[in-house]
Structure formats: C-alpha cells, structure tokens
C-alpha cells in the first residue's frame, strides 16, 4: 500500500464515523487526522433545512472570520477617482475602470475577490458571464458592491468569507488551516455557523441546521452535533 494511502487509512481510524462530536473535539480531531505533509485547508460543510430553489429560502452572505482563513487573497477593485485611491491605500492588488474590464475580458483572472463601487456596475455587468460562474461577480448582499471600498478591501484581506447555499442545501466554506491553533479553528467555525443562523430565512420550517461536518483537504470528515447550537439557532 502506498505511503499516502496508509496515512489516509490511519487518519480515518482516528475518527469515529458513527459519532457526532462537539465543535471543540472536531477541531482537535481534524488537526490530528490531517494526513498530508502540506498545510491542509480546513473546511466546514453545513447542510441547511432550506430549499434554495425557492428565492425566499436562498441563504447567502459573508462573515469576517476572527482569525482569517490562512489564505492571502488577491483583491481586484473596479473604482474611479478618490474611491480608486482609497482602494489602493487599503491594499487592493488591482484597481481600475474600463481598462481593467477589458483586461478581464481578454483573459486576466489572477485575483480571488472582486469589489466594485455602485457607479461601476454598468461596466462590470459586461463581465457577468466570466465572473458569475466563478462566484466572483460583485454583489451588494455580500458587501462587494459598495462605496466603502476601504472597509471592503480591508475585510477581504483580513479573511472575510462569502457563503452561498448550493442546490443540495449545503454551504461549504473555508475556515482556516491545519496549522491554526484548535481555539482559532473553533472561533472561526463558530463565527460561520452563527452567521448562517442569523441568515435563516423566515420561510424555513423545521430543523434548520441539519448537519455540520468539518474536514481538512486530505483528511476524513468529522461530524459535529448541531444540538450544541440549537438553543441559539432554531425554533422548529
């Protein structure tokens, strides 16, 4: 058996797949069970009791993780005049107007987050077919269409995570790296879960937090018991 396969088998043995853990236990297990030599990303998958096919049950938003994501984001901003200067001062990697729109249309995609001032959306709209499928299209619901570019850029650089429920009712989001301390992963995961709780649609009925699973890039999934959040989260 190859060495990598042996490590994966050993990692799975650490986790009881039939058990649901507390969030703190899950953070410790994910770190312990990560089999790769590189600094694996830690993700959270939350299955919600919503039907995203219904517009009034779409769950979408963004949250700043207190300890960041461990990823260095390249931020592109569509702005002009003073707002362009503010974006540059805040640390944006790329700032421009029509010239930048043209550059993206020509194939430039060396960025991870896109922010735009409202007056630029007429131009940015031309990039819908390019940015949309990649989840990069600026949207006021997640704070990426705003005149407050200074805050938007600063939050993106600090570890602001965007989330959106998929067709199966699941939200996937990065919450850090295996190298993070257990408490940092715990705080980040809790911040995301509480953001999802606050985003619960009024039309969602029954159990809202159906399941929560934490995993590293190469490691096994660790199930977290949603009951630990029910007191704060849902009315059936």
From Swiss-Prot:
GO CC annotation terms, alphabetical: cytosolic large ribosomal subunit
Function: Binds directly to 23S rRNA. The L1 stalk is quite mobile in the ribosome, and is involved in E site tRNA release. Protein L1 is also a translational repressor protein, it controls the translation of the L11 operon by binding to its mRNA.
Name of the protein this chain belongs to: Large ribosomal subunit protein uL1
GO molecular function annotations of the record: rRNA binding; structural constituent of ribosome; tRNA binding
PANTHER family the record matches: 54S RIBOSOMAL PROTEIN L1, MITOCHONDRIAL (PTHR36427), LARGE RIBOSOMAL SUBUNIT PROTEIN UL1M (PTHR36427:SF3)
A single GO BP: translation
NCBIfam families: rplA_bact
One Pfam family of this chain: Ribosomal_L1
InterPro entries hit by this protein: Ribosom_uL1_bac-type (IPR005878), Ribosomal_uL1 (IPR002143), Ribosomal_uL1-like (IPR023674), Ribosomal_uL1/biogenesis (IPR028364), Ribosomal_uL1_3-a/b-sand (IPR016095), Ribosomal_uL1_CS (IPR023673)
Quaternary assembly: Part of the 50S ribosomal subunit.
Record keywords, A-Z: Repressor, Ribonucleoprotein, Ribosomal protein, RNA-binding, rRNA-binding, Translation regulation, tRNA-binding
Species this chain originates from: Sorangium cellulosum (strain So ce56)
């Amino acid at each position: 058996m190859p060495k990598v396969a042996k490590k994966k088998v050993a990692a799975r043995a650490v986790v009881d797949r039939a058990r649901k853990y507390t969030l703190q236990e899950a953070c410790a297990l994910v770190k312990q069970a990560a089999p790769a030599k590189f600094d694996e990303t830690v993700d959270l998958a939350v299955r919600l009791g919503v039907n995203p096919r219904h517009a009034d049950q779409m769950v979408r938003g963004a949250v700043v993780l207190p300890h960041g994501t461990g990823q260095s984001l390249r931020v592109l901003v569509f702005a002009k005049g003073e707002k362009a200067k503010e974006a540059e001062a805040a640390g944006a990697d790329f700032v421009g107007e029509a010239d930048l729109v043209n550059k993206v249309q020509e194939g430039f995609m060396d960025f991870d987050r896109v922010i735009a001032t409202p007056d630029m959306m007429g131009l940015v709209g031309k990039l819908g077919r390019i940015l949309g499928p990649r989840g990069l299209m600026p949207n006021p619901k997640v704070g990426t269409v705003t005149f407050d570019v200074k805050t938007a850029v600063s939050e993106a650089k600090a570890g602001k995570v965007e989330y959106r429920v998929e067709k199966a009712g699941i939200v996937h989001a990065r919450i850090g790296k295996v190298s993070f301390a257990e408490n940092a992963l715990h705080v980040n995961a809790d911040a995301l879960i509480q953001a999802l709780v606050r985003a619960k649609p009024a039309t969602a009925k029954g159990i809202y937090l159906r399941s929560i699973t934490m995993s590293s890039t190469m490691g096994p999934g660790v199930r977290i018991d949603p009951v630990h959040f029910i007191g704060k989260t849902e009315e059936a």
